[in-house]
Amino acid sequence: MAENGKNCDQRRIAMSKDQHNGSLTDPSSVHEKKRRDREERQNIVLWRQPLITLQYFSLETLVVLKEWTSKLWHRQSIVVSFLLLLAALVATYYVEGAHQQYVQRIEKQFLLYAYWIGLGILSSVGLGTGLHTFLLYLGPHIASVTLAAYECNSVNFPEPPYPDQIICPEEEGAEGAISLWSIISKVRIEACMWGIGTAIGELPPYFMARAARLSGAEPDDEEYQEFEEMLEHAEAAQDFASRAKLAVQKLVQKVGFFGILACASIPNPLFDLAGITCGHFLVPFWTFFGATLIGKAIIKMHIQKIFVIVTFSKHIVEQMVTFIGAVPGIGPSLQKPFQEYLEAQRQKLHHRSEAGTPQGENWLSWMFEKLVVAMVCYFVLSIINSMAQNYAKRIQQRLNSEEKTK
């Protein structure tokens, strides 16, 4: 493994020497070398170079731990204050007394908020490929509440076990008592907390670009470097992706708060560029974060909630199952597992999971569980690849700086 890493380093040194003797000062040569370095880093993935990837991942982990240890060491007063606060909270949590009823209530709400905020941060913070937690967690939760609300004619699910498990209340509501607004209100906390998490996850690109602009230093971030290149070659942009990025940049720069609000409210993959743009042009923090928070946690979240609730409303689901059954040839065989799944969910809601249909696992549930596991595993693999590529970039930058000093 060490020999593979050494050979990889030697290839980089050879490439650097080939481009030395003044050629690196030429802008086209610099751009070409950056492209080659980027392509070389992109090849450092587990399925192509597993040993080097794991080695670089381990070394990058040690570097990051060392950096954070150094930062915490230079902020000893903050660390000590945090530890004292934590000790006081632990003592309050474990000491018996009349306050325990409030402690339990606060603990329940804190864990609920932390869970959904954490999932929101994972969705947008930019670790690896990003974990699509709306599709994996929040969307299915809203769909489950919607199906249960129409089946029970109520959203007053017993707590506990809600939200871990949904069962119908003893006194079910009248037929037609469920409205779109009642379901929206039921899942408002979870959805808003998830939206707040996604807004928090958009802060790193903003802070990175702002710090780079104030210090005048070039940050160690490819997205920011691409952003600067895009600004330099704005007139020559021809492809759709470049023109879309420029449109987002101009909207945010010229319109300000409402431009950021519009970008945050509409689902789009280019919002990271809005954060970089705001940081680069020194947009005030509360202007950026306020617009992002309102857009993601309120406007965008309600759009997504309404879409899921309407899609999984009772009559729409029944029409979808009927439509599947109408497919020539394979319709009935495809329709059966959907009907079995819906029937099993109804029995669970009415406390009848032990009777009626057999409890063999439905293949729809099995497929979704395996999909969740696969996406989480891919997310972890992407983090390993990303950290390994970060370490490779450190090596390339060190070699480039050594070449410049020769």
Swiss-Prot record:
Chain residue ranges for the region called VTT domain: 173-316
Sites of N-acetylalanine modification: A2
Alphabetically ordered keywords of this record: Acetylation, Autophagy, Cell adhesion, Cell membrane, Endoplasmic reticulum, Lipid transport, Membrane, Transmembrane, Transmembrane helix, Transport, Vacuole
GO biological process: autophagosome assembly; autophagosome membrane docking; autophagy; cell junction assembly; cell-cell adhesion; embryo implantation; lipoprotein transport; mitochondrion-endoplasmic reticulum membrane tethering
Coiled coil residues, start to end: none
Catalytic activity field: a 1,2-diacyl-sn-glycero-3-phospho-L-serine(in) = a 1,2-diacyl-sn-glycero-3-phospho-L-serine(out); cholesterol(in) = cholesterol(out); a 1,2-diacyl-sn-glycero-3-phosphocholine(in) = a 1,2-diacyl-sn-glycero-3-phosphocholine(out); a 1,2-diacyl-sn-glycero-3-phosphoethanolamine(in) = a 1,2-diacyl-sn-glycero-3-phosphoethanolamine(out)
Basic and acidic residues bias (residue ranges): 1-20
UniProt GO cellular component terms: autophagosome membrane; endoplasmic reticulum; endoplasmic reticulum membrane; endoplasmic reticulum-Golgi intermediate compartment membrane; nucleolus; phagophore assembly site; plasma membrane
Principal subcellular localisation of the protein: endoplasmic reticulum
Signal peptide: none
Membrane topology listed for this record: Multi-pass membrane protein
Region listing for Disordered, in residue ranges: 1-37
Mutant phenotype after disruption: Mutants show early embryonic lethality with lipid accumulation in the visceral endoderm. Intestinal epithelial cell-specific knockout show accumulation of lipids in intestinal epithelial cells.
Extracellular side stretches: 99-109, 272-273, 327-363
One MF term in the entry's GO annotations: phospholipid scramblase activity
Keyword Ligase listed: no
Comment block on domains: The VTT domain was previously called the SNARE-assoc domain. As there is no evidence that this domain associates with SNARE proteins, it was renamed as VMP1, TMEM41, and TVP38 (VTT) domain.
Similarity-based family: Belongs to the VMP1 family.
Functional note: Phospholipid scramblase involved in lipid homeostasis and membrane dynamics processes. Has phospholipid scramblase activity toward cholesterol and phosphatidylserine, as well as phosphatidylethanolamine and phosphatidylcholine. Required for autophagosome formation: participates in early stages of autophagosome biogenesis at the endoplasmic reticulum (ER) membrane by reequilibrating the leaflets of the ER as lipids are extracted by ATG2 (ATG2A or ATG2B) to mediate autophagosome assembly. Regulates ATP2A2 activity to control ER-isolation membrane contacts for autophagosome formation.
UniProt protein name: Vacuole membrane protein 1
Lineage: Eukaryota, Metazoa, Chordata, Craniata, Vertebrata
Gene: Vmp1
